[in-house]
């Protein structure tokens, strides 16, 4: 597992300097508002088995008065749609958020055009299972070719295998509970 984490870290460091500087100036307010989560790459143990049953999720991003990131999400669960609120604290270095007390070790934006899509990297640890994800956030119900291409590029670049990647099912029922 340490080798995978090192590979992911090296891939993040290998980002072209111009792009890394560009994202360093990212204003969190540009990420605010409603998003559809259309694709996911995950190293979670059960993801490869469950990925074909996962539906599009909805996320509404807001900032707290303390400049923490608040994520309201709605996704399909075992008993229908479930909603949750996650608050992430801003780190001092760069545009990175975290909340280790709930298992979110890092959340950062890998790529975005500020209007249509964002590629989000998250390092998580639940129980004794550390893993990371890459998610494609989209302002629309369908992703652009540019967004899908970047999602695929980042996922592969960070070492995700094809069975660890999924375009989510187009059932928007749960997403629309908070996005409509």
Swiss-Prot record:
Q: What family, per the record?
A: Belongs to the calycin superfamily. Lipocalin family.
Cellular compartment(s):
Secreted
Disulphide connectivity of cysteines: 81-174
State if Disulfide bond is listed as a keyword: yes
This chain belongs to the protein called: Epididymal-specific lipocalin-6
Q: What molecular function terms (GO) are annotated for this protein? A: small molecule binding
Q: Name one GO biological process term.
A: single fertilization
Q: Which Gene3D superfamilies match?
A: 2.40.128.20
Q: Name one GO cellular component term.
A: extracellular region
């Amino acid at each position: 597992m340490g080798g995978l984490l090192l590979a992911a870290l090296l891939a993040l460091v290998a980002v072209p300097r111009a792009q890394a500087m560009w994202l360093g100036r990212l204003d969190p307010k540009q990420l605010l508002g409603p998003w559809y989560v259309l694709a996911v790459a995950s190293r979670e143990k059960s993801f490869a088995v469950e990925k074909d049953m996962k539906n599009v999720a909805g996320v509404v991003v807001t900032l707290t008065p303390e400049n923490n990131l608040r994520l309201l999400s709605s996704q399909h669960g075992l008993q229908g749609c479930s909603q949750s609120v996650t608050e992430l604290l801003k780190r001092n270095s760069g545009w990175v958020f975290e909340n280790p007390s709930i298992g979110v070790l890092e959340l950062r934006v890998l790529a975005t055009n500020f209007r249509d899509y964002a590629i989000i990297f998250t390092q998580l640890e639940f129980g004794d299972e550390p893993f990371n994800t890459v998610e494609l956030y989209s302002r629309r119900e369908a992703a652009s070719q540019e967004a899908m291409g970047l999602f695929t590029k980042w996922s592969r670049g960070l070492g995700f295998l094809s069975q660890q990647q999924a375009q989510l099912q187009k059932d928007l029922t749960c997403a629309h509970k908070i996005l409509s």
